[in-house]
């Protein structure tokens, strides 16, 4: 019976592979078959010590594949999606995986991808892009100084006006009132932003010092700006 593996770039998928390989040397028995090559292609890297069965299997398949291609490799990197099968290598019928007299050299490395394999390849690419995007989306800690119009400005409402500004990637933090002189106080307030989502200049010009918040806020200055 055919076995289906999915999400082999995730811990859940590797756990399924680990359980399947318990007591087995290869995917479909004690001999390497095209099934192993297909699953191997869907695993991003050696699963590691957390998956001993899968890790041992991965190294074994890698060793067999290396022996199948004795030529010296300089090492290459391939970008983009999965390429369609080359016309120079037409699809051939896969031998039945009966385990009797199978030869590693007979494995068809150029067989057409199944729907599950295409889906797995797409999921791997999506996972890589999500990981890259997460790494690139840094955060910053910003300290703002918010000044009122005069000593008659209601500072409680001023702070409420500041915190009323909400947008994706913006989190308001601690604040305090600092005396300036002549009965006037200013508000200092911390905020954390996701750099790719929030522009501090836009936040100040288009939200904090524009209507209706400019009824309480005269100006806003950046006191400190630090990457997290």
Curated annotation (Swiss-Prot):
> What keywords were assigned to this record?
Acetylation, Cell membrane, Elongation factor, Membrane, Protein biosynthesis
Q: Where are stretches of biased composition, namely Basic and acidic residues?
A: 116-138
PTM annotation (N-acetylalanine): residues? 2
Q: Where is the GST C-terminal domain?
A: 14-65
A molecular function (GO) term: translation elongation factor activity
**CDD domains, alphabetized:** EF1B
Q: Where in the cell is it found?
A: Cell membrane
Query: Where do Acidic residues bias regions lie?
Result: 95-115
Q: Which domain of life is it from?
A: Eukaryota
Q: How does it sit in the membrane?
A: Peripheral membrane protein
Q: Does the keyword Ribosomal protein apply?
A: no
Which protein family is named in the record? Belongs to the EF-1-beta/EF-1-delta family.
Subunit field text: EF-1 is composed of 4 subunits: alpha, beta (1B-alpha=beta'), delta (1B-beta), and gamma (1B-gamma).
Q: Tell me what this protein is called.
A: Elongation factor 1-beta 1
What species is this protein from?
A: Arabidopsis thaliana
């Amino acid at each position: 019976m055919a076995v289906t593996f999915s999400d082999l770039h995730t811990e859940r998928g590797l756990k399924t592979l680990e359980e399947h390989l318990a007591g087995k040397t290869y995917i479909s028995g004690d001999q390497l078959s095209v099934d192993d090559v297909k699953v191997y292609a869907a695993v991003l890297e050696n699963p590691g010590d957390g998956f001993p069965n899968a890790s041992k299997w991965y190294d074994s398949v890698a060793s067999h594949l290396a022996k199948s291609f004795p030529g010296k490799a300089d090492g290459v990197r391939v970008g983009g999606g999965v390429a369609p099968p080359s016309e120079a290598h037409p699809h051939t019928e896969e031998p039945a995986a009966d385990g009797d007299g199978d030869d590693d050299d007979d494995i068809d490395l150029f067989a057409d991808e199944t729907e599950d394999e295409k889906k797995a390849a797409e999921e791997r690419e999506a996972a890589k892009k999500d990981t890259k995007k997460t790494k690139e989306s840094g955060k910053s800690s910003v300290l703002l100084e918010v000044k009122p119009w005069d000593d008659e400005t209601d500072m409680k409402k001023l702070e409420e006006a500041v915190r009323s500004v909400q947008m994706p990637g913006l989190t308001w933090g601690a604040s305090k009132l600092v005396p300036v002189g002549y009965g006037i106080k200013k508000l200092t307030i911390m905020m954390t932003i996701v750099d790719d989502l929030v522009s501090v200049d836009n936040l100040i010009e288009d939200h904090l010092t524009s209507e209706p918040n400019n009824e309480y806020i005269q100006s806003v200055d950046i006191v400190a700006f630090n990457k997290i």
